[in-house]
Amino acid sequence: MTLLNTLSNFGGTWPRLIIMSMINYFTVYQCTIPGTNKVYVTHGGSMQACTELLNGTVTILRDGYYITNLICIVVGLFLYFGYLKRKILHLQSLPISSWRFFHFFFTILAVTSRAIYYKSQNWRREC
C-alpha cells in the first residue's frame, strides 16, 4: 500500500513541476530601479535580485500562465485527434464479451474442462 501511495504521489508531482517551470519560463518581468532610468526586462528565473539587491520594483509584463494554458490545450487536441479518438472508436467497436474482466480466463477454463470431460468419457469407454 505504501508503494502504491508513493507512485501516486510521483504521478501527481512531476506534471506540476513541468507546468510551473513552463509558467516561469514564459513569464516576462520588468525590473524598475528607483532613482535611475534603468529598466531591465527578463523572462523566467527569479526576480529576487531586483527586489533585494537593487531595491527595485517588479512588474509582470506578460503572465506565462496563459501561454502555458494555450500550449497544453494544443497538445491535448493533437493527442486526442491524433491518437485517442482512434483508440476510443476501436474500443467502442469491440463486443461486450471482450469487456468482461475474466472473459479470457473463463474461456480457457471452459475449454480445459471440456477437454478433461471428453478425455474421461473416452477413458470410461475404453474400460
UniProtKB/Swiss-Prot annotation:
<protein>
    <recommendedName>
        <fullName>Uncharacterized protein YBR219C</fullName>
    </recommendedName>
</protein>
<dbReference type="GO" id="GO:0008521">
    <property type="term" value="F:acetyl-CoA transmembrane transporter activity"/>
</dbReference>
<dbReference type="Pfam" id="PF13000">
    <property type="entry name" value="Acatn"/>
</dbReference>
<feature type="transmembrane region" description="Helical">
    <location>
        <begin position="64"/>
        <end position="84"/>
    </location>
</feature>
<keyword id="KW-0812">Transmembrane</keyword>
<keyword id="KW-0472">Membrane</keyword>
<feature type="transmembrane region" description="Helical">
    <location>
        <begin position="101"/>
        <end position="118"/>
    </location>
</feature>
<dbReference type="GO" id="GO:0035348">
    <property type="term" value="P:acetyl-CoA transmembrane transport"/>
</dbReference>
<keyword id="KW-1133">Transmembrane helix</keyword>
<dbReference type="GO" id="GO:0016020">
    <property type="term" value="C:membrane"/>
</dbReference>
<dbReference type="InterPro" id="IPR004752">
    <property type="entry name" value="AmpG_permease/AT-1"/>
</dbReference>
<dbReference type="InterPro" id="IPR024371">
    <property type="entry name" value="AcetylCoA_trans_1-like"/>
</dbReference>
